[in-house]
Amino acid sequence: MANITRMANHTGRLDFILMGLFRQSKHPALLSVVIFVVFLKALSGNAVLILLIHCDAHLHSPMYFFISQLSLMDMAYISVTVPKMLLDQVMGVNKVSAPECGMQMFLYLTLAGSEFFLLATMAYDRYVAICHPLRYPVLMNHRVCLFLASGCWFLGSVDGFMLTPITMSFPFCRSWEIHHFFCEVPAVTILSCSDTSLYETLMYLCCVLMLLIPVTIISSSYLLILLTVHRMNSAEGRKKAFATCSSHLTVVILFYGAAVYTYMLPSSYHTPEKDMMVSVFYTILTPVLNPLIYSLRNKDVMGALKKMLTVRFVL
């Protein structure tokens, strides 16, 4: 907050202008309705998944505990950007103060970083379940799961605490127009009138590290899973193992692919329009897709949903 105040004193201005999605749309009202519906579906889908996991005893396992954490992150993730964007469209306002921008940036970085590490933790959980089934209850007991989940949230917040203060401390005098629908680090950094090349290099290295550690864990886990599945004699066992892992791999590819584009590709690959479309995909659409991916192909989740609906219908 002190850095943001110093920045405001230096520039004499405290508001950014979010250019957003709606300026380029021929039908902004229709786009607003679509995004609002998607937002509600994301919240309701993830909330239902959390409720099912909490209420159904058959889903009280480490795998579903981590899925519930992912749903919680997705609900917070989409809530950081979409409500502000829709409210601005309704009110006809596109300004965001520096403190609000910094807070949005911090929450976004924290949640994105936490999800990176959570997806790696989920891959490790699948490795233990498939490769060491007899030791699974001991290796992944409730205390270990809580520790791993807490570690994911903590490591994600490190990214937010590192990048947000530095980004918001730069003097902004070229322009105050953020060509994005929220305060994303690259979109804000480009507005600075000071030399940010060193910071961009450090940010790149930080993002590589944030991606490299989880990707290494995920790759190693699935390599060992493939070796174990290959040695299985039971075709049914192979099918179940692949079904369990395919949902997680789908989410990993969607989320990490978008992150690699945003933070690791050279600036020559980027345009404001491309960046916004990619951001729409992983900040708005991914939270909608995750509960569908984890539930539609999961017999236990669908069984719990049918049971809950049957009980409510009978009552």
Swiss-Prot record:
Keywords: Cell membrane, Disulfide bond, G-protein coupled receptor, Glycoprotein, Membrane, Olfaction, Receptor, Sensory transduction, Transducer, Transmembrane, Transmembrane helix. InterPro entries: GPCR_Rhodpsn (IPR000276), GPCR_Rhodpsn_7TM (IPR017452), Olfact_rcpt (IPR000725). GO terms for biological process: detection of chemical stimulus involved in sensory perception of smell. One of its GO terms (cellular component) is plasma membrane. It holds the Pfam family 7tm_4. It is found in: Cell membrane. It comes from Homo sapiens. This is Olfactory receptor 2T29.
